[in-house]
Structure formats: C-alpha cells, structure tokens
Amino acid sequence: MSAEFDLADIKRRMQGAIATLKHELGGLRTGRASASLIEPVNVEAYGQTMPLNQVATISVPEPRMLSVQVWDKGMVGAVDKAIRNANLGLSPTVEGQVLRIRIPELNEQRRKEMAKVAHKYAEDARVAIRHVRRDGIDVLKRLLKDKEISEDDEKRHESEVQKATDQCVADVDSALVAKEREIMQV
C-alpha cells in the first residue's frame, strides 16, 4: 500500500468536522445558561480585541444565570458593552466587578429557528465528511489506476472509508438529536 492513502488521516479530518459541529452547536442559545454562549464575545481591552475568557471568569451559578467575574475593575464597562453588542439578546446587570446575565426563556418560534440553524450546521458537517470520503476514494482510484494497489486492496480500503463515513455521520446525527432535544425543552 502506498503512503499516499492514510485512513487515520481521513478519520482525523472527519472527526475535525464533528468537532467543528459540536463547537457550533455549543454556541446556540437554548434557554439554559452555558459559558460557551458568551465565550466567543470579544472585548476591547488594553488597546486590542481579546476574547472574554482572557479578561474575566465565566461561571454558571444557576441554570438560567451566567456570572462574569471581571479581573480588572476598569474593564467592567467594556465587558458589559461587548456582551450587549454581541447580538445574543442578553442584558448584563453590573454588581461591582461581577456581571450577572439572566438567560431568558426562548419562545416557540425562536426554538424552531434555533432547531433550523442546528440542522444547517449538521448538514454542513455531513457535507464536509462526504468531501473527505470523496478525497480518500479519489486517492484510492488514482493508486489503482497507477497500479500501486490491487483491486482487492482498493475495494477493502474503500469499504473502510465508507465505514468511517457512516460512523461519523451517525455521530453528527446523534449530536443534532441531543441539541434539538435541549433546544425544544421548555
């Protein structure tokens, strides 16, 4: 077998698509407090833009409440402004160096919109996985054409690629179902 075909690399790239999906799903608001909801918020701090988690500690003291402990007292206003301007529909309450953010419940229409976004993310992940599969199968076909592998090896490796694809698509589907359940939970 040629060094050009690497099943481990194909699996790693497919797992990368799943990791991206899980990160994207983690950012979807579900009505339940999660630090991942505001982690991507960037704050203007010390003359540059920094992620929120580099200027404050984010915690979840209650199921529908986030607490942001700002390390530098002078940064409280900038953190408050960054969270308000992040288009997340959140309004922090400032208490000294701590910002408390109540997570409002989602209405039915917003839940359905979130579910559609989750479906789109999942479909994007499936497409990425299929692209990786196609790349792997193209390499196998080229190796077969160049007579570097036998037909039997090509079929066996193609079957392994398909099995990895099926497993990764099943992982995407289970992540989507779990997120949908979380979104639709009242």
Swiss-Prot record:
- Provide a GO biological process annotation: cytoplasmic translational termination
**What's the chief localization of this chain?**
cytoplasm
Localization, per the record, is: Cytoplasm
Write one Pfam family the protein is assigned to.
RRF
Query: Quick check: keyword Protein biosynthesis in the entry?
Result: yes
GO MF annotations in UniProt:
ribosomal large subunit binding
Which CDD domains does its entry note?
RRF
Q: What does the UniProt keyword field contain?
A: Cytoplasm, Protein biosynthesis
Give me the Gene Ontology terms describing cellular component. cytosol
Q: Does the keyword Metal-binding apply?
A: no
Source taxon at top rank? Bacteria
- Cross-referenced InterPro entries: Ribosome_recyc_fac, Ribosome_recyc_fac_dom, RRF_sf
What is stated as this protein's family in its record? Belongs to the RRF family.
Question: What job does this protein perform?
Answer: Responsible for the release of ribosomes from messenger RNA at the termination of protein biosynthesis. May increase the efficiency of translation by recycling ribosomes from one round of translation to another.
What protein am I looking at?
Ribosome-recycling factor
Species assigned in the record: Methylocella silvestris (strain DSM 15510 / CIP 108128 / LMG 27833 / NCIMB 13906 / BL2)
